[in-house]
Amino acid sequence: MATIYKVLIPLPSVDFDPSETSIPWKILKENGYEVFFATPNGKPGSADFRMLTGKGLGIWKPILIAHKKARTAYNEMISDPNFQNPISYKNLKAENFAGLILPGGHAPGMKEYLESEELQKFVGSFFATGKPVGAICHGVVLAARSKLPGTDRSILYGKKTTALLKSQEMAAWNLTRLWLGNYYRTYPQSVEEEVRSALKDPNDFHFGPKPIFRDNHKKLKWGHAITDGNYVSSRWPGDAHSFTVSFMKLLSNR
């Protein structure tokens, strides 16, 4: 009987990015993986409504909203029994999963996930097992804040990584700040700046090709994913397909 690998996707209660969660979920499910979710309180989470509806994005809605296929995948995902019955952070055990995906999101509700000491401790212990870990966009901030057990060093120290680029973050903020304020600025420090500060060498941060087009299953080269050992990272929703394919390669090599 073939082994069914279990992959965990932790989430905040609200405001996670729908594309960076639902696209990996859908691709993993289609390839025979079982996907579980975790939230702070064990109750189902909900994605950033602006990314789903485009409300408040003004004239930039067509380029900033989650793409239609991602929104469709999200609606499928939230009907999944595992999504409706998430595990609470406090009950997570690394031995129960073969892989871990850390999605992103930029709205204020993400801070609950990014700043959770309980979740950071779990991520650190999971990384130490050598099992596959994937982080995309702000999910790389969670990885950067997580420490290897018994050390004061980030799990990313000595690793090559990418994350949301400062140029991307500032562009989205500048397009919308007149009416949305700091919606696109989760923290005063950019994702790129915080992640680079956690690395052994700031040059271990990889920018990749200019992020113009969103990738898809036929255009994986439009995306960007960096793999270093058991760890794979990507920058934004436009990398989600290539990110997940790279993550699955790590799972299949175990």
Feature names for model-found ranges:
Residues 1-129, 142-254:
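Extended, subdomain-level signal for the structured scaffold at the beginning of enzyme domains
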Residues 132-133:
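Glycine- and acidic-residue-rich phosphate-binding/metal-coordinating active-site segment common to enzymes
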Residues 137:
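Catalytic, metal-anchored helix/loop core of enzyme active sites in primary metabolism
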